[in-house]
Amino acid sequence: MEPPDARAGLLWLTFLLSGYSGAQAELHVSVPPRVEVMRGEQVALDCTPREHPEHYVLEWFLVDGTGARHRLASVEPQGSEFLGTVHSLGRVPPYEVDSRGRLVIAKVQVGDGRDYVCVVKAGAAGTSEATSSVRVFATPEDTEVSPNKGTLSVMDQFAQEIATCSSNNGNPVPRITWYRNGQRLEVPMEVNQKGYITIRTVREASGLYSLTSTLYLRLHKDDRDANFHCAAHYDLPSGQHGRLDSHTFRLTLHYPTEHVEFWVGSPSTTEGWVREGDAVQLLCQGDGSPSPEYSFFRQQGTQEEQLNVNLKGNLTLERVHRNQSGIYGCRVEDYDADEEVQLVKKLKLHVAYLDPLELSVPEELFVFLNSSSTVVNCSARGLPTPTVRWTKDSVTLADGPMLSLQSVTFDSAGTYTCEASTPTVPLLSRTQSFQLIVQGAPELKPNEIMPKSGNSWTEGDEVMLTCSARGFPEPKLTWSQRGDTPAEPPFEGRGWKSSSLMVKVTSALSREGVSCEASNIHGKKGHVFHFGSVAPQTAQAGVAVMAVAVSVGLLLLVVAAFYCMRRKGRPGCCRRAEKGAPPAREPELSHSGSERPEHTGLLMGGPSGGGRGGSGGFGDEC
């Protein structure tokens, strides 16, 4: 580390020296009058004669506490350099003289903080000296505080020990200040009832100083939440200052109860209602310290039923019942409290309840279609008095316990719900429902059909017929034609059942119609689907005629071929007749031996056939 500038802040000291033969000569010596350095650093002390005589000797002396001088070094210039001799005083590391003739003190300790005298001897020019003071600074260790860990009473009429603060191994002696909630405490050192401090300073073997400060205060109840700490202030070179703060701490105080609070800790209404079956907490709290005992009781007329005693101020009523409604009390057992302080607090606990709802009808209520009036009553018992309403499909039907059903239709069927609740007590509610079943003959709803195009149907058109029915008991759907699908609920619901039938439109079907019928034990109802006029399929009829003609022609050809094959072996069959009249012959018999006159007439030429002349002759016969 660089030594501080020994020339900084020079004080020129002028000495008047005597010369020979009564003549006087002046010699001035320049040294830094005060050198400040941190402990452990290095310092170099400069000593320079102002007149620069040709030859001189420079000597350094250490002045001890008694004022005695001890020679440290002798320095003599040789050209541009200085030759020095160091006289050891047992210092480690020893004193040194550098090439500029300065006295070097390495690793400065507190003991090096002395006065150093530089003496310059210049022969005929005279002798002069000057003193340089070295001041050593040391930063103390971290500030430590030891608070009083006992219980301090605010009822004491004198100052009590609060804490002890220590700042160790500093130089010069540090200073200690005290703070409450960040504000400095102006506490004197004189003993008094309100507060004071005591200070003890110790010089350690190292030469450093340790300071201990103890704070005494008369405490008040407001100090229960106060944060205290101390700080050590110390000096640094060049007029600088440092500060080391301790950690903050709080005190444990003993003070009597002045106020008591008693309330319901679990969820409750502003009126004090709690739900039956809940776990209810009763909380009691006094502002005394340490926490006193809390005694819980229930008021039974003029008597008190003792419930619990604890230090937590907490009483839990598990699964509270309606018969536990009443007046509850809390007593703070603080014998240091003032007689005027109210140590007993009471509250009234209201247990809200709601019994299961009762309906005047069974879970399934059967009524007949178009019945005049049916009244259903919902009985709700509870505290506070519940409000009741009737709903169906989340729609409110009536406010109050009475539900009147008039002119009942199938649309009236469904689930009716009685809802009871207590607006002042959240989440305390009940519901009860019944199913209304309407009995009666079926209602039928056909699905109207329209022609595919135009205003008429065409022969062969396919159409899906649908019938929907409802009633109780559930109606049965039947068709006048076969092929219907099983009944199934339609999209609209509400008890409707549907059945579908796929048919092809024909003229006969148009005349007769297609009917569907719904029936149950209470009656039946039907509907006939008509198709109106049905146009023939012209293009398709022509194709059918052509197909029949082709079939007939093919049949004739097959018959002719078969006949020819049968007659192939007979004489004169299938050959050309000779010219002239054929000879007379017997008629042929069939294979069965019977005559075939029809064949004879068909195969032989008639009277006009034999008279043909020229090249005509008989045509082929067969």
UniProtKB/Swiss-Prot annotation:
What is the role of this chain?
Transmembrane glycoprotein that functions as both a receptor and an adhesion molecule playing a crucial role in cell adhesion, motility, migration and invasion. Extracellular domain enables binding to extracellular matrix proteins, such as laminin, integrin and other ligands while its intracellular domain interacts with cytoskeletal proteins like hemoglobin, facilitating cell signal transduction. Serves as a receptor for laminin alpha-5/LAMA5 to promote cell adhesion.
Q: Which residues are glycosylated?
A: 314, 323, 370, 377
The name of this protein is Basal cell adhesion molecule
Note the SS bond partners. Answer: 47-118, 165-230, 284-330, 378-418, 467-516
Q: Which SUPFAM superfamilies match?
A: Immunoglobulin (SSF48726)
UniProt topological domain (Cytoplasmic) ranges: 563-622
Sequence intervals crossing the membrane = 542-562
Residue span of region Disordered: 574-622
